[in-house]
């Protein structure tokens, strides 16, 4: 993760952008899943605390779905520079999801063929590796709840999901600093303060 943040800071500095690392910074940091990342991104973007969010998870797919579950978040999936360019130029979204564990390499034509073969073969939702199945299925169920709740007014959506999810998402010191220093939507700021008991 340090290498990712280093490269993001370098690229952003060239363009005159400021970077806030509000996610995890290591295994001993404030614990966030891709579900929490979606909540954080939605709060930051809808409150206009930031203009763009870079997120991710092991494969990048969970973060992509979690961010896109929320109104006001338009997240693309990026595994190579062409993806980032086309997303920025064609889709003009406000978030990217990156795979932080899964690699991508030579033989793109073979890779895409295997992607399609694997996507349509066998029963879906079985988890991988097997020992992570339960947590993956739990997170998939939670994400479905989040999407259902988020399909309402933004704050009504936040209020309709498990409050513990939101409290965990906003509990990190770096998130709070970036959010409270930059948020421009008073209603969303008041909601987050209420969640934090302020």
Language model features: what each stretch is:
Residues 9-18, 69-72:
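Short helix-loop-beta junction
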Residues 2, 38, 60-66:
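Short glycine/serine/threonine-rich phosphate/pyrophosphate-binding segments
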Residues 51-55, 74-76, 93-97:
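Structural motif
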Residues 34-53:
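Short, structured active-site "lid" loops
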Residues 62-75, 79-83:
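Short Gly/Thr/Asp-enriched flexible loops that form oxyanion-binding sites at enzyme active sites
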Residues 16-31:
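A short beta-strand-loop structural module common to alpha/beta enzyme folds
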Residues 24-25, 78-84, 100-102:
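Short, acidic/turn-prone active-site loops that include or flank metal/cofactor-
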Residues 1-6, 10, 85-198:
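C-terminal binding/interaction regions
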């Amino acid at each position: 993760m340090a290498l990712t943040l280093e490269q993001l800071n370098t690229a952003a500095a060239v363009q005159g952008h400021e970077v806030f690392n509000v996610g995890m910074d290591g295994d001993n940091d404030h614990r966030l899943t891709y579900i929490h990342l979606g909540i954080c991104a939605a709060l930051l973007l809808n409150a206009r605390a930031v203009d763009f969010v870079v997120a991710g998870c092991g494969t990048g797919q969970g973060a992509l779905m979690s961010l896109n579950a929320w109104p006001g978040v338009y997240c693309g999936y990026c595994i190579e520079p062409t993806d980032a360019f086309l997303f920025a130029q064609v889709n003009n979204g406000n978030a990217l999801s990156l795979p932080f564990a899964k690699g991508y390499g030579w033989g793109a034509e073979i890779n895409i063929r295997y992607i399609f073969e694997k996507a349509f073969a066998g029963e879906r939702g079985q988890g991988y590796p097997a020992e992570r199945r339960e947590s993956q299925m739990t997170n998939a169920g939670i994400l479905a709840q989040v999407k259902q709740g988020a399909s309402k007014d933004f704050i009504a959506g936040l209020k309709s999901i498990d409050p513990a999810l939101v409290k965990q998402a906003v509990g990190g010191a770096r998130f709070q600093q970036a959010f409270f220093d930059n948020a421009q939507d008073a209603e969303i700021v008041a909601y987050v303060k209420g969640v934090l008991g302020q």
